[in-house]
């Protein structure tokens, strides 16, 4: 039993080191910002191909955020982290942020996904940026609302005036799960 615990500890430690190493590839602040922006643009293009009306929803919003996340789950728990950028549509100002996630439950594997948040109001966007936003739970439905004209189809409401699209390597994910996730400013990039 001690060998199993020791092995699990080493697997989790290795997984955390791998996640940390992926975020340290770029050397300078400008290179890191450029890498995040490049991933954000690729993610938006992937989203627009999967859900063309998302482009209109994002353009008409107060702003949006794009995060690239990597999660690892081993037996009874998992962890993940990521980074991204929030873009204010009025000012074009970019705020770089990080994400950490904790999961409980049985499982084993590595998951890569990207989240695109759409902020209907400036207040919702500023709250996300400044409050170290965090949430837990599961949302599983994209809906058509009267004020969005179907533009949010494939997205899930995760907070008041905040919608989220989640993309995997296979495309748009209709079932979105975020458990114990926290988003916060990346002081080293802002």
Q: Which sequence ranges carry the predicted segments?
A:
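Small-residue-enriched, tightly packed secondary-structure blocks
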Residues: 27-190
């Amino acid at each position: 039993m001690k060998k199993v615990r020791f092995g699990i500890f080493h697997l989790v430690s290795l997984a955390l080191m791998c996640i940390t190493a992926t975020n340290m590839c770029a050397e300078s602040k400008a290179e890191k910002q450029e890498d995040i922006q490049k991933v954000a643009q690729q993610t938006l293009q992937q989203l627009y191909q999967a859900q063309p009306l998302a482009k209109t929803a994002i353009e008409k919003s107060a702003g949006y955020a794009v995060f690239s996340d990597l999660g690892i789950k081993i037996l009874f728990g998992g962890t993940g982290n990521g980074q991204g950028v929030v873009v204010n549509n009025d000012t074009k100002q970019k705020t770089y942020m990080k994400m950490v996630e904790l999961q409980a439950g049985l499982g084993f594997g590595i998951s890569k996904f990207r989240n695109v948040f759409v902020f209907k109001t400036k207040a919702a966007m500023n709250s996300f940026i400044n409050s170290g936003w965090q949430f837990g739970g599961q949302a599983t439905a994209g809906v058509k609302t009267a004020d969005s004209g179907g533009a949010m189809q494939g997205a899930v409401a995760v907070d008041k005036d905040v919608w989220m699209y989640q993309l995997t390597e296979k495309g748009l994910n209709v079932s979105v799960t975020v458990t114990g996730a926290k988003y916060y400013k990346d002081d080293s990039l802002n």
